[in-house]
Amino acid sequence: MASDDRPLALTLGDPSGIGPEIALAAWRLRGERGVPPFQLIGDPEFLEATAYRLGLSVPVAEVEPDDAVEVFARALPVLPLPSGAKVSATPGAPDSANAGAIVESITAAVDLVRSGAASAVVTNPIAKFVLTRVGFAHPGHTEFLAALAAREGREPPLPVMMLWSELLAVVPVTIHVALRRVPDLLTQELVERTARIVHADLRARFGLEAPRLVLSGLNPHAGESGTMGTEDRDVLAPAVAALRAEGIDIRGPLPADTLFHERARATYDVALAPTHDQALIPIKTLAFDEGVNVTLGLPFVRTSPDHGTAFDIAGKGVAKPDSLIAALRLAQRLAQRPANNVTPFPVRA
């Protein structure tokens, strides 16, 4: 299959969360919202039951990978889990009995992309505690995908999480760690490696010839010359200097409290921030329903909706599919970009 003809591989996510219902909703809106063809990897009977319970007139078809695009016009294509495992879940009641199916769906999606049967991976939300209860060894989705991407006997690539929207794109340098651990983890090497990956993928995947990056400070006022913490002066500033010496357009460290207003956003393409919440709070404020999680540094395209499992509203029929639809559309654009040479990035000011 040509790249433009291949479907996206959508994972099951946690079946007790909103993933299954937003997948059904995305399929229903395929014409109205320009949703590209995708196949969901899971249990067809479970998806049928979910549609029935929610009162959604969504036909579900069990498919082989080669059939997904043709079927997508008339039914939601569901590729059974390779093991044939069945899924049973109660909305809002996460169950570690489904951990195996959740992990198998992710692994199968990566296998489809690596074999050429799918163009990109789009992941539905998972709950880490459901998986860690049964011995899952990875901090989250992103790190597990990096492990799957590693070639036999080689170190996994450094995965970089970018949250993308039409208004703002951000990268947290440290991800799912306690805030008190950040100063020890925030090394000059980590900042430089992260920025290099962002720069390289913005050029290769997003089509930006000269990406403009900024780096937020860690401390108030970016440390104010060391009077409010030394990390900005001793770690972040040397990293920026080293990156600029390599020809990467990056500024910082800059005070975080003035980095995300409209005029500031017009001066850069991506903002890197030392901590998870420094990066995610502004994008979720600006684009809560439209943000997309994009993993950079992998040998394949992976996107995800920028929200969690939402167990509190699962099964109530109120979950919005907007972020999933944005993730599906961006994944297709990134997978096709080398062929159509159209950048998925917002028009720069």
UniProtKB/Swiss-Prot annotation:
It is an enzyme of class 1 (oxidoreductase). Pfam families: PdxA. Its cofactor is Zn(2+); Mg(2+); Co(2+). It catalyses: 4-(phosphooxy)-L-threonine + NAD(+) = 3-amino-2-oxopropyl phosphate + CO2 + NADH. GO terms for cellular component: cytoplasm. GO terms for biological process: pyridoxal phosphate biosynthetic process; pyridoxine biosynthetic process. It is found in: Cytoplasm. Its EC number is 1.1.1.262. Substrate binds at residues 141-142, 284, 293, 302. The keyword Metal-binding applies. GO terms for molecular function: 4-hydroxythreonine-4-phosphate dehydrogenase activity; cobalt ion binding; magnesium ion binding; NAD binding; zinc ion binding. Homodimer. Catalyzes the NAD(P)-dependent oxidation of 4-(phosphooxy)-L-threonine (HTP) into 2-amino-3-oxo-4-(phosphooxy)butyric acid which spontaneously decarboxylates to form 3-amino-2-oxopropyl phosphate (AHAP). PANTHER family: 4-HYDROXYTHREONINE-4-PHOSPHATE DEHYDROGENASE, D-THREONATE 4-PHOSPHATE DEHYDROGENASE. This is 4-hydroxythreonine-4-phosphate dehydrogenase. It comes from Methylorubrum populi (strain ATCC BAA-705 / NCIMB 13946 / BJ001).
